[in-house]
C-alpha cells in the first residue's frame, strides 16, 4: 500500500509538472505571436471599402512603416530572404522582372495582407524552408494585384521554397473581395497545406492566433480554395479518419485547447460582440470564449449590426473587454487607477493551481497597428489608404497614409530609431513615453488621451475627403505626378501634426497629473493658480479609489495601517 501511495504521489507531481509545462508553452506562444485581425467586406462598410485591421503585437517589434518603391529587375535576379521575426537569413528566391510599390501591408493596387499566428501541430513546422510568414506577406504584395492572385502566389512560394513558420491565418483583401487563408507546414516535407475562404459580402470576420476555419465547401472555387492534399495529408498523419465532407481544417491541424479559446478566440468574441450587437448572440458563445465549451464554436463570420467605418473599426482595436465578464479593470491587479494591463508573464501559479491574466485586443506590446482601406471606386493612387499607428492601440491614434506616396513620413521612417536605439523624432518612442505615463494613472489620463484620439481621427476623416478630391482633379487633368506629390504631402503633414500634438500632450499630462495629483484648469484650458499671480497652482484634486480597492488594501495590510485612538 505504501508503495502504491508513493507511486500515486509521484504520478500526481508528474501530471502537475506536465500541466505547468503545457501552460507555460501556451503562454509563451500567446506572448510571442499574439496579433489580432478584423476583416470588413465592402458590403459591410459605410463607404463600400474593403478593410482589414492588424495589430502587430510583439515585445521585440519596433513600430515603423515599411516602404518599397516599384522597381524593375534584370532577368535572372535573385532576392535574399530574411526571417521577419528574427532577421535570420533564410536563403534566396527568384526575383520577378517588375515589383509593385508597397507601403506597410498594402501595395499600389490596393491589395492588403495581414496575419495572426496560430502555431498548430508542432511536428508540422519545417525549419528548413525559406518563405517565412512575414516574407510571404511582403514579397507577395510586391507581385500580386488581387486577393486571388495573392493566394496563388503564396501557394507557389510554399510549394517551391517551403514554410519555416508555424500555422498562420492571413487576411487578404482587394477592392472587391476579402479572404481568410489558413496555412500549416508539412513537417520535413517541402510545401504546406492550406484552405482559403472568401468572406461573403456584407459580413465581417476576425481571427486572433487560433485557426478559425472548420468545415469548408469542397466544390465552390468562387468562395473556397484549398490544396489538393489538404484532407489526404491529414489522413496520412492520423489527424482525420472521417468522410471528406466532415473534414475540419482547425480540428485536424490546430485543435483548440483551453488556452487557444481563452487567450485567442476570446478576442474574436470581443470584436463580434462590439460590431454585432443585435445580430451576434455574445451570451450564447460566452462559454466558448471562456474555454469551457469548445464544441460551441463561433461562426467564421457575422453580419454587423450597422455598417462599419474606419473610426468604429479602429475603436474595436482599443478594446479591453470593457463591460463584459472578462473586464479586468476592477480586480486588485488593476490597482487604484483601474489599469486594464498586466505585465508579463501572463501566467502564474498559486498553491499548485495555474492562473492566467486576460489577453485583450489592445495590449501594451504592440509595435504598429493599422486599419487598411481598399476603396475600389477611386483610382489606385487615391484609393489605397493605410490608417497607421504605433504602440498600444488604446492610447494611440492612427493617421491616413496613401499607398502612392513617394516617401514615408519622418516619424514612421524605417531606420529612425529601433528597439534598442532611442530617437526623439520617432513616433514609436514618443507614443511609448506618453502611454507609459498613462499607465501610472490610467483612469485619469486615458479619458484625456481618448478625447485627443477621437478629435484627431474624426478630423482626419474630414480632411481626407478634401485630399481625395484635390488629387482626383489632378488625375483627371492628366497630372499624375502632381496628384501623387499632393497625397505624399498630405500624408506627411498629417503625420507631423499627430507627432507634434503628442509632444504637447507629453508636457501637458506631466504638468496636470504629476505626483498623483490632478491640477485644476480654467475653461480656456489654462491651469488655475491660487490667486497670488506667482504661478502657484490652486489646490490639486485627489480622487479616492473605489471602495473595492480600499478593502483589498485593508485585507492585505490593514492591521499595520489601522489608525489608533
What does each model-identified segment do?
Residues 18-28:
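Bacterial N-terminal signal peptides
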Residues 137-144:
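Short, well-ordered beta-strand elements within core beta-sheets of diverse protein domains
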